[in-house]
Amino acid sequence: MANSVCEVLLTEARLKAPRDDVDVVAGAVVDFWGIVRGSEEGREIDGIEYEAHREMAEHQLRGIAQQAIEKFALQLIVIHHRIGFVAAGQSSLFMRVMSQHRAEAFRASQWAVDELKKKVPIWKRAKFKIDNQPAREGKRDRPAETHLISRG
């Protein structure tokens, strides 16, 4: 869409929802928050350390956002992802999707989160409460210094 907006951000700062400016053609806004659970592999954790291959992660996030705009006719997609340590109960991912109709907004949000988990090189390592041992190496999951990647 010619007037669509795509915003992607990797940050070590706590996530906040952007302002609520809504396009007059939008009929639906879906906000998704990915929250760090208090357990991993059945054990209590203090939180998760996220790391990323920054340049590749930025590239993949931009690509996913652009694909979502085209595939679901979105007016807006915002993807903010944390890196660094994220405590249990804090958000590691914020995504806002805006479209003319709710069905597209929900589908786009689900699709974009699934694509992010499959394609974006962001890795997690749980910090366990009892023994502070890292999770199994190589486990790949999601939900990233504040750095606005793109907006346009």
Positions of the model-derived regions?
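N-terminal, polar/charged subdomain of small-to-medium soluble alpha/beta proteins
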Residues: M1-S91, M98-G152
